[in-house]
From Swiss-Prot:
Top-rank taxon: Bacteria
Homology family: Belongs to the bacterial ribosomal protein bL20 family.
Keyword Ribonucleoprotein among UniProt keywords: yes
Entry-linked HAMAP family: Ribosomal_bL20 (MF_00382)
GO CC annotations, alphabetized: ribonucleoprotein complex; ribosome
Name of the protein this chain belongs to: Large ribosomal subunit protein bL20
Organism: Deinococcus deserti (strain DSM 17065 / CIP 109153 / LMG 22923 / VCD115)
Role description: Binds directly to 23S ribosomal RNA and is necessary for the in vitro assembly process of the 50S ribosomal subunit. It is not involved in the protein synthesizing functions of that subunit.
Coiled coil regions in record: none
InterPro entries, sorted: Ribosomal_bL20, RIBOSOMAL_L20_CS, Ribosomal_protein_bL20_C
SUPFAM superfamilies in the cross-refs: Ribosomal protein L20 (SSF74731)
Gene3D superfamilies, alphabetized: 6.10.160.10, Ribosomal protein L20 (1.10.1900.20)
GO molecular function: rRNA binding; structural constituent of ribosome
Amino acid sequence: MPRVKTGTVRRRRHKKVLKRAKGFEGSRSKQYRNAFQTLLNAATYEYRDRRNKKRDFRRLWVQRINAGARLHGMNYSTFIGGLKRAGVDLNRKVLADIAAREPEAFKALVDAAKNGK
């Protein structure tokens, strides 16, 4: 078998890494070694933050629902508990959207939660 020199393979691999490192500052986007190390760290942040994103959005939805419920004299936990008892089966994402965009519909949900006791 003939010996394969690494030139073209290395260049292709380095180009791939440097392409992914576009937008990084300074030598992190220009030099292969710095770009590679930065991409390793970026991958751990990507992995971590894909999971944190779910937590962050749920917290945002809860805050929006709580704000909407407090406008009608109720807090979040009693509102959610009342909805469960009333048999309203909407998730927090939808409830937050209704609270932000359709105040009349949210008022009806608050009334349902109050009567669901």
